[in-house]
Every structure is written in C-alpha cells, then in structure tokens.
UniProtKB/Swiss-Prot annotation:
Biased composition regions of type Polar residues, renumbered to the chain: 71-86
Disordered: region residues: 61-86
Protein species of origin: Shouchella clausii (strain KSM-K16)
Gene3D superfamilies named in the record: 6.10.250.660
Membership in a protein family: Belongs to the GpsB family.
Transmembrane feature ranges: none
The keyword Coiled coil is annotated on this UniProt entry: yes
Domain of life assignment: Bacteria
Location(s) in or outside the cell: Cytoplasm
GO cellular component: cytoplasm
Protein name: Cell cycle protein GpsB
The organism's taxonomic lineage, starting at the top: Bacteria, Bacillati, Bacillota, Bacilli, Bacillales
Function in brief: Divisome component that associates with the complex late in its assembly, after the Z-ring is formed, and is dependent on DivIC and PBP2B for its recruitment to the divisome. Together with EzrA, is a key component of the system that regulates PBP1 localization during cell cycle progression. Its main role could be the removal of PBP1 from the cell pole after pole maturation is completed. Also contributes to the recruitment of PBP1 to the division complex. Not essential for septum formation.
Oligomer status and interactors: Forms polymers through the coiled coil domains. Interacts with PBP1, MreC and EzrA.
Length: 105
C-alpha cells in the first residue's frame, strides 16, 4: 500500500483564515482547502484500515505462538512422580540382573 502524505494538522485546520472577496469568501480558496481536508481524511481512513488488518494478523500470530508451547510442554514434560517410579523400576531390574537371586536369599 502506498503511503499517502498527510498535508494538514489539526492546528492548521483550526488556524486557517479564508480571505474575503466582495461577496464573501473566495470560493476557489475554500474549495481547494476542503479538497485537501478530504484527501487527509481518506488517507487517515486507509491508514486506519491497514493498521486494523495488521493488528488482527498480529493477534492471530500471538495466539498461535502462545498455543504451541503449551501443547509441547504437556506432551514432553512427564510428571516427576512417574519419572522417579520409572528410575526405581529400572534400578530394580538392573539389580536383579547383576546380583541375581543372591540378593533375595
């Protein structure tokens, strides 16, 4: 999306004085100024729409990123109790193989 340059600030709009001709304000000057204001509003609207889309994409990415670690942690992290039990079971099996039935006599 091409960047549209913003031509007016709020202060410039507030401080704008139109020169008066014999029948009131110079119509061409007022029309040009209003055209510039309209262009700025259009530029603001496009920028807002772009930022809203970008914001939505970032929210979706963040949601995906926060879901991934939770799933992997629950799958890969066994509880401490089951890990200790597995170690004790392996140790017991190893003792039986190394020492045989002598241990239990």
């Amino acid at each position: 999306m091409s960047q549209m340059e913003i031509k007016l600030t709020a202060k410039e709009i507030l401080d704008k004085d139109f020169k008066q001709s014999m029948r009131g304000y110079n119509q061409d000057e007022v029309d040009k100024f209003l055209d510039t204001v309209i262009q700025d509003y259009e530029a603001f609207q496009k920028k807002i729409e772009q930022l809203e889309r970008e914001n939505e994409l970032l929210k979706q990415d963040l949601k995906k990123q926060t879901e991934r670690p939770q799933r992997s942690q629950t799958v890969t992290t066994p509880s401490a109790g089951s890990t200790n039990y597995d170690i004790l079971q392996r140790l017991s099996n190893l003792e039986k193989k190394v020492f045989g039935s002598k241990m239990y006599e």
